[in-house]
């Protein structure tokens, strides 16, 4: 097997494996490991990404005095111990077990807490649950691209006549609405739960490398039509205003969806935030593992999954009470794909929301597109929390 990153990792970022982490052998990248006793920052990637997606911010964080840890999450990359079959039990990918994965890694490395857990895209809900469930371990949280809107509530006071909460439309209900539009559409997260999704992307007619290049380009600030805005409601007519990487044409898979947005040779040459060698890392790793493990989370962590809903209702009415920050690209539709989520995050779900930053010149891949600015924002947030903690101790 080739070295992780195909020699594109920055010097000072190392790759290693840790055994016996909640049933996994976890592959991780780390920086700032040379000095013991440093405060820890845990970085959780999204889909279709890897620990590798954090490579550009790890050294700046390490230079600021942190031990920086970025694992390939369950289902991804070179972390092993999960089943790559669509017919496998998806329960290990449920919210609380993903929290146990994060806890197990922190403990295995000899730490009792981290100063912050940072999650991007599909890593954002995992980071949210970590901060919600174990604030004693995860002392602050930074969410990127995917806002946290809180846990599902248990019906309150219904014995005395109060109306039960009105459930939000499920992905299946939204998908059925989208199918009835004049231009029939489908919701990408609903499609990601299907058996066909893995084969569609693995066997992309354009090849896996070209698939990743087009997919990353289409969701980045380089695709000039990414001009997101708040949607009025989670209904088909509103959701259909988003690009097809989120609300796909009904008759197309993701490979066919992104193919027309393949950048030109000149655009690829001009793309300094994601070189051809770096695209090759994603193509190599996913070419080896497939997408099924990474997609399992969509099957069990969406809001209409009964088991996950029941699991999360244990924390009904509980908020994230550790210091929180939200960072996303200014041209990232992920901020708005769930209407009202940002407002709920700021007003109720996170009681200590310190900052909300929309970064210029970035789409969905904010820490890769604008790593210097993201590093600056992360370090500023972390140093502010350290300053506040120092003042409390005086």
Can you say where each PLM-predicted feature lies in the sequence?
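Flexible "cap/lid" subdomain of the alpha/beta-hydrolase fold that forms the substrate-access gate
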Residues: 2-17, 26, 40, 76-118, ...
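Conserved beta-strand scaffold positions in the cores of enzyme catalytic domains, especially
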Residues: 15, 68-70, 356-358
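Short, flexible hinge/linker loops that cap or flank conserved catalytic cores
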Residues: 20, 32-36, 318-320
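Conserved HGGG/HGGXW glycine-rich cap/lid loop of the alpha/beta-hydrolase fold
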Residues: 24, 29-84, 107, 120-122, ...
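Residue-level preference for short coil/turn positions at secondary-structure junctions
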Residues: 36-37, 64, 111, 320-321, ...
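Short, hydrophobic alpha-helix immediately C-terminal to the catalytic nucleophile
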Residues: 52-55, 103, 128-132, 375-379
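Catalytic active-site module of serine/aspartate enzymes centered on a nucleophile-bearing elbow/loop
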Residues: 352-394
